[in-house]
């Protein structure tokens, strides 16, 4: 029953198409178009966090890798056919430019990656306008995959949840690392180079006593 609803909702979204939105959704679903956005996020984080940026960048790279590879792993485990590869739907699916993608579609890698970026970045930026904007951006990316005929709504929803979980988990791991490792290391470095409480004169006084 749930699968039937998923298919019906897919057909409703996929059939509500036009030449204009075909071009818009195809463009939104591309990867290179969003490179300026990713660069803008990194620049903002670099300005805001300065010395911590390198550590943050490492966590961002780890999160992106985990999101992408985990979605591929789930695809190969579940092996749910994309709607455009489903024999019972192939004839009615509206495909833009005839592009269907790989055989399996659960979960959507686009949705996983987009919500990973959204959740991880909004946890660092912490601005209401940004939170709303980046979540809407990720949702539109997910919607475009349904519109283009390459994913069911269920693929996108579950991919979104997976990506959001990965983004939140990596931010939590960063906070834990920053609190328990980086700050302790900074404290150790400060105390290890701190001069005696008496200052340089204390050495002279000690020498005099020995004389």
Question: Which stretches of residues belong to each language-model region?
Answer:
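Membrane-helix interface segments
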Residues: 20-21, 50-55, 126-132
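Interfacial segments of alpha-helical transmembrane regions
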Residues: 41-70
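Membrane-embedded catalytic cores of phosphoryl/pyrophosphoryl-handling enzymes
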Residues: 94-204, 209-211
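Hydrophobic, aromatic-rich transmembrane alpha-helices
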Residues: 37-48, 114-122
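Small-polar-interrupted transmembrane alpha-helices in polytopic inner-membrane proteins
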Residues: 60-75, 130-144
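Membrane-interface junctions
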Residues: 15, 30-34, 47, 51, ...
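N-terminal transmembrane-helix/juxtamembrane module of multi-pass inner/ER membrane proteins
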Residues: 1-37, 70-102, 191, 209
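Alpha-helical membrane-inserting segments
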Residues: 41, 66, 70, 74, ...
């Amino acid at each position: 029953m749930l699968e039937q609803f998923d298919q019906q909702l897919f057909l409703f979204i996929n059939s509500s198409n036009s030449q204009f939105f075909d071009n818009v959704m195809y463009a939104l679903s591309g990867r290179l178009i969003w490179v300026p956005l990713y660069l803008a996020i990194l620049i903002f984080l670099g300005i805001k966090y300065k010395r911590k940026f390198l550590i943050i960048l490492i966590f961002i790279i780890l999160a992106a890798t985990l999101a992408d590879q985990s979605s591929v792993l789930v695809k190969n485990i579940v092996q749910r056919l994309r709607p455009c590869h489903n024999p019972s739907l192939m004839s009615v699916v509206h495909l833009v430019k005839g592009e269907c993608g790989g055989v399996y579609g659960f979960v959507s890698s686009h949705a996983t990656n987009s919500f990973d970026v959204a959740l991880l970045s909004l946890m660092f930026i912490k601005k209401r306008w940004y939170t709303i904007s980046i979540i809407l951006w990720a949702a539109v990316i997910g919607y475009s995959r349904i519109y283009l005929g390459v994913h069911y709504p269920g693929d996108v929803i579950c991919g979104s949840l997976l990506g959001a979980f990965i983004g939140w988990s990596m931010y939590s791991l960063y906070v834990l690392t920053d609190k328990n490792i980086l700050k302790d290391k900074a404290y150790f470095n400060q105390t290890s180079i701190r001069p005696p409480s008496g200052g340089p004169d204390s050495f002279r006084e000690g020498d005099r006593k020995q004389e």
